[in-house]
Amino acid sequence: MEVARSLPYTSGSLLSAARAALENGVAVSPSSGFHHAGYDRALGFCTFNGLMVTALALRAEHPKLRVGILDYDYHYGDGTDDILRRLELNWVTHCTAGQTYLYPDQATAFLDAIPAHVARMAGCDVVLYQAGADPHIDDPLGGFLTTAELAERDRRVFQHLHDHGIPVAWNLAGGYQQPLSKVVAIHRNTYRACKTIYDVPMTRVAP
């Protein structure tokens, strides 16, 4: 029961952010723990797949809407792929960097690939961006980007989404460094990048 009660504050928060992004162009949900949860299972700190809950709820509200999921957590979004495969959803464009980019010598290739990843979302009406902190090179469960490279990742994502005119709702995703202030600093850099590109007050949503 306690787990069920958390749903409005996690998946519901991302859905609210996505609705706000459709209206305002950009919004943030301070939530994490989504992309490993699959069609019929919880996994890897993820109880519900809020990315897919949000996508399906938006599609129910707007039957022709197309959703992009840009997953830049360090780990592969296996739960998201599981749901997409089982439901055979062809209106969701899913890009998960955790399938390909894992090592420090891939940092430049990853950053250079961001424009192409965003371009894949060009037909989408909204993008859900998982801005993971666990790709940081010092993260115990991740590690291939420096702090500066993570900041550049976010700048490029927001710049290219803005240039394409695609609304974006972003969330925090993984981050496991201790003390927690190290993870918070990475999330603050994501916020700064978004604020700089969009030059608008951020919409912080409640469930």
Describe the predicted segments one by one.
Residues 1-207:
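A general "terminal functional-core" signal
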